[in-house]
Each structure stands twice: as structure tokens, then as C-alpha cells.
Amino acid sequence: MKRIALFLATNLAVMIVFSIVLNIVYAVTGIQQGSLSGLLVMAVLFGFGGSLVSLLMSKKMALRSVGGEVIEQPRNETEHWLMETVSRQAQQVGIGMPTVAIYDSPDMNAFATGAKRDDSLVAVSTGLLHNMTRDEAEAVLAHEVSHIANGDMITMTLMQGVVNTFVIFLSRMIANAVSGFTSNDEEGEGEGGSFMTYFIVSTVLEIAFGFLASFLTMWFSRHREFYADAGAANLVGKDKMIAALERLRMGQESQLEGSMMAFGINGKKSLTELLMSHPPLEKRINALRQL
């Protein structure tokens, strides 16, 4: 419930800000709300713009949000092993050496992010390093490296941009029709009443459509997890990957949020699997056993 409430609150804030900004853009540019071509252009700009900016800033934002410390020069045997393992796996899949970081957290987790395959980040929690064997940790790293090699961050960004565009376009097209209908029925309210109707309806629809669209993006995220698991199995062997997932079943729920959670090794539980960024661990383990 906490995750769903946070999702709704975040989307509400984003949609309200978007509505205000887009209405200002309409006023400045003179584009009519009823112009479908103009609305589509604005929907594409805002729909893809936010996703692309988030992707480009993902490394810095991720490090700041978890308090991650980048390993510039390994200071101990664990950091040496971590750097060497990521470097070897990156060479195996043909990507540039990712930036490697460690963040302080009791949960066993790791995540990957970055705008390009050759300019990415792999971050590992202290809980994972302290509680997993080297074989298990190696499998987790292989999972994250596979996410990078598969281009999952870029693909997810493009998909989110398309989803955002449709959400914005459809909600505002419907809001425009509703405001036009009510303004004809209630001429006494004038332009102010029509604008408020448009603003309220578009905001509510953007929140509702955004929530429904999250089912699609979460499905895609779960789908990519199976591919990352399979990629890790190819790199280090499926027995190590299964052992890592078995270990995760004994750990606590992931503390990662947002896009980092989507590309972490372990996701959060939800009231329904449809709202989970990761498949249940049992399904992932069974899929690996069938390889």
C-alpha cells in the first residue's frame, strides 16, 4: 500500500506541474487546445522530454539518492574483487567498464543505470557484500551487467516516453471535448469556467491513465528481469544465479525506489503481481531451472 500511495502522490505532483506548464506554453505560443496536431507535438515533447532527462541524469541522481560511493581506487580486497568481477563481465558482453559504487544499506541488492552501454553505473549494497557468498554476489553482478548489455535502461525510457505521450494526448483531447461541451451548456461561466473544467478534467485523467499505464511498464520490467537472469546464467552459470535468488528469498524487502528498483536484482512486494517491477522469486528460479 505504501508503494502505491507513493506512486499516486508522485504522479499527482508531476501531472499538476505538467498541466500548469503546458497551459502556459499554450498561452505563450498561441497553440489552440483544440488543435490535435499542436497537442500531439506538445505531448511528444513533454512525454519523451521527462523520460530522456531522467535517463541522462540517472547516474548522478541514483548515486545521490542512495548515498553511493564510487570506487576510484580499490582500498581493500572486497573492492578489488568487485572491480575485477565487473570488468571481466563487461568484457565478456562487450560493453565499456561501468562505474562501480557501493552504498550503505542492510538489504541485499544492487542496481544498474546509465544512458549508454559504455557509460553506465553498477551499484552494490553493503548488505549484499556482507551476506552473500562470492559466487552469489558474482551472479548478481552478472544480472546487472546483463541489464546494461541488453540496453534495458534505454528501452524502458523509450517505452515510458511513448506511454507518457499517449497519456497526455488522450487525457487532454478528452478534457478539451468535455470543456467545450460544458461551456456550450453554461455560457454564463465564460472562458474562466471552461479553463477550470479543462484543467481539472485533464489532470484527473492524466493521473488515472498514468496509473493504468503503469501496469504496462511494470509488465515490461518483469519481462526484462527474466532476460537479465538468463544473461547472468550464461555468464556465470545458472546454479550461481539460482543460489543468489534463493538467498534473496531469505532477505528483507528491497529499499530501492523508482527506476533504480526497476533495474535492481530484487524488487518490492505488492498487493498484486501486476504492480510489481520484478517477477516473484519463485517464478524466476523456476525459469532458470528450465534453461
UniProtKB/Swiss-Prot annotation:
Subcellular localization(s) per the UniProt record: Cell inner membrane
GO molecular function: metalloendopeptidase activity; zinc ion binding
Active site: E144
Membrane topology designation: Multi-pass membrane protein
Keyword Ribosomal protein in record: no
Residue positions binding Zn(2+): H143, H147, E225
Main location: membrane
Cofactor notes: Binds 1 zinc ion per subunit.
Residue intervals passing through the bilayer: 4-24, 36-56, 151-171, 199-219
Pfam entry (one): Peptidase_M48
EC annotation from Swiss-Prot or TrEMBL: 3.4.24.-
GO CC list: plasma membrane
Named cofactor requirement(s): Zn(2+)
InterPro entries (UniProt xref): HtpX_protease (IPR050083), Pept_M48_protease_HtpX (IPR022919), Peptidase_M48 (IPR001915)
Keyword list, A-Z: Cell inner membrane, Cell membrane, Hydrolase, Membrane, Metal-binding, Metalloprotease, Protease, Stress response, Transmembrane, Transmembrane helix, Zinc
GO biological process per UniProt: proteolysis
Family from the record: Belongs to the peptidase M48B family.
Protein name as catalogued: Protease HtpX
Organism of this sequence: Aliivibrio salmonicida (strain LFI1238)
Name of the gene: htpX
